[in-house]
């Protein structure tokens, strides 16, 4: 299964607001569970991961955002900045790391803050 950064962002937004974004309805249970487990593994959320008999993550109980989770969400919250990140960093055919995405989001937020 693949990491879905759009879903990661939606899950973080949901955790912060306690409201389910309507876009979450398009995801199946397996995809939701896997990406929720990734949030815990990445240290963006405190929680516990459930694994199948092969040790693959299949779900997670998400408790609350961590400091790092709040920081990432603060960078990714603005729809304009997120759209730019999807166009430049997350577009198909380009390899990226989470660190690269987070740095791009921080730089775009910094530019917006400084009016550059």
Protein language model annotation of sequence segments:
Residues 56-89:
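Short, amphipathic alpha-helical interaction segments positioned at domain boundaries
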Residues 76-116:
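Exposed, interaction-prone assembly regions rather than primary DNA-binding/catalytic cores
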Residues 48-50, 54:
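Beta-hairpin "wing" of winged helix-turn-helix
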Residues 3, 7, 11, 31, ...:
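Residue-level detector of well-ordered alpha-helical segments, enriched
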Residues 31-45:
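Basic amphipathic alpha-helical segments that dock to polyanions
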